[in-house]
């Protein structure tokens, strides 16, 4: 497969099932040793007619396919349908809507919507890059409908809460600036409020001690613990004060809102974190450690390298059952 190819070429390449099968088998088991995703045993045999493997270890579910133990598990759609969708989602800068998938792939809009959320789960940050360090920017933004556009009943309810942004959802972002061989990285999550007791644990979970943290006085106005060097800029007077600014994370907010407002139009708060994960993945896979632009194919492979051990059922997606936690299973 060419490292540089257009979307049209990728679709043509993946129309052949055997080609998809060979590609995914090599990606999942690069050393050629197929392991059972349920028990990790290598005592398996490939059944040509059924296109599945059989594990000879003693457990109830002996047979497994390429999709077992991945975000694709139990999907009636073949890899020749899934792989072009993954390519589109990870490489379209502003995302792709379920209606576009419906039109291009010939599936229902409901199926396309479910497919997209499963791909977003694969794009969720596995935190394999380690803690953020150096110069880090911390900020938050509000996502949701404007007060003036709300129905009267919802507007009254929002005003009762006493929040200037009504019932908008708060997204907190932490961005590590580029330095040397390190490229920009962002971690973003949904938070309930802007209080220190809520934001401080998020910072502690993602930022190394001794890091210089940049924020604006309106956002993180409280003083950081002494283990961090906290620098603040007052946006009422200027946006940049020497090296102190939050321009990097604000650029990420711009990309996030462009995708939500332009591509998806409206996003339910219940699912917002999935769209945040999607944009964060694309942001973090723009350049490699040498500063070279990551190709669409390499970004595509990065997303596929994160499909194992993640499962999202339709009931979990719609809130009818708890979402399955990620399991550590052999890739």
List PLM regions with ranges.
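Residue-level recognition of single "structural anchor" positions
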Residues: 1-331
């Amino acid at each position: 497969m060419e490292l540089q190819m257009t979307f049209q070429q990728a679709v043509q390449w993946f129309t052949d099932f055997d080609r998809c099968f060979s590609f995914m088998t090599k990606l999942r088991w690069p050393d050629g040793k197929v392991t059972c995703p349920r028990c990790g045993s290598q005592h398996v045999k490939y059944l040509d007619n059924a296109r599945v493997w059989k594990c000879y270890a003693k457990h109830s579910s002996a047979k497994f396919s390429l999709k077992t133990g991945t975000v694709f598990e139990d999907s009636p759609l073949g890899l020749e349908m899934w792989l072009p969708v993954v390519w589109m989602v990870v490489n379209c800068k502003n995302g792709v809507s379920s209606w576009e998938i419906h039109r291009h792939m010939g599936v229902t809009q409901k199926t396309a919507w479910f497919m997209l959320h499963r791909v977003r789960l694969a794009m969720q940050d596995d935190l394999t890059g380690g803690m953020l360090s150096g110069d880090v920017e911390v900020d938050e933004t509000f996502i949701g409908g404007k007060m003036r556009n709300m129905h009267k009943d919802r507007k009254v309810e929002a005003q009762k809460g006493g929040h200037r942004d009504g019932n908008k959802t708060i997204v907190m972002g932490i961005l590590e600036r580029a330095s040397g061989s390190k490229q920009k990285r962002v971690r973003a999550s949904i938070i309930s409020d802007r209080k220190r007791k809520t934001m401080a644990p998020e910072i502690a979970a993602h930022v190394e001690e001794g890091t210089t943290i940049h924020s604006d006085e309106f956002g993180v106005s409280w003083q950081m613990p002494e283990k961090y060097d906290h620098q603040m800029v007052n946006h009422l007077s200027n946006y940049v004060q020497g090296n102190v600014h939050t321009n990097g994370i604000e650029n990420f907010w711009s990309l996030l809102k462009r995708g939500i407002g332009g591509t998806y139009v409206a996003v339910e708060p219940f699912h917002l974190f999935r769209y945040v994960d999607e944009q964060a993945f694309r942001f973090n896979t723009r350049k490699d450690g040498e500063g070279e632009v990551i190709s669409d194919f390499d970004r595509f492979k990065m997303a596929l390298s994160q499909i194992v051990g993640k499962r999202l059922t339709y009931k979990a997606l719609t809130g009818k059952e708890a979402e399955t936690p990620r399991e550590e299973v052999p890739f």
